[in-house]
Regions:
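Conserved Class I S-adenosyl-L-methionine-dependent methyltransferase catalytic core
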Residues: 1-27
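Alpha-helical subdomain
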Residues: 17-148
Length: 148
């Protein structure tokens, strides 16, 4: 499993450096299932004009709030409890899904994405930063066991 936890695409720096965040100006990014907010904090530090909202389950958000937010990120990174299987309440410029969909069958991934429809408008971006799984029965048995 170590191989799946390493590499340039697993670090927040890869996402921070390889998406045109500056093109959003003072836009809002919702980090869906954003856990403790570490990725949102990395984005906010590199692109201070952005506002980031970290959404996750209430228990995860409460735990995240126990950690003190760096002073330079106060007012730039917020935490909000939200179940991504319910309608998205925040209008944003980007909805970020980082390592979310590989945990769910396709039908659930579709259900998660459908919850964005009411707040989508022209120009809104849905960013998916996730593992790509090989087609079933195309990798070695060892790899299949590790990734599924």
């Amino acid at each position: 499993m170590q191989a799946f936890g390493e590499g340039p695409d697993i670090t927040p720096a890869f996402l921070v450096d390889n998406f045109p965040w500056d093109s959003l100006g003072t836009g809002t990014v919702v980090d869906m299932g954003g856990s403790n907010g570490s990725v949102s904090m990395a984005i906010a530090q590199a692109h201070p004009a952005l506002k980031l909202i970290v959404q996750d389950r209430p228990d995860v958000i409460e735990a995240a709030k126990e950690n003190e937010l760096p002073k330079d990120l106060i007012g730039k990174v917020e935490f909000m409890p939200h179940d991504f299987f319910t309608e998205q309440p925040v209008e944003a410029d980007v909805y970020l899904f980082r390592y979310i969909f590989h945990n769910w069958p396709d039908a659930y991934a579709v259900k998660i994405l459908r919850q964005l429809v009411p707040v989508l408008r022209p120009g809104v971006r849905v960013v998916v930063n996730d593992h790509l799984l090989p087609e079933p029965n195309t990798a070695s048995l060892t790899t299949e066991r590790e990734v599924r």
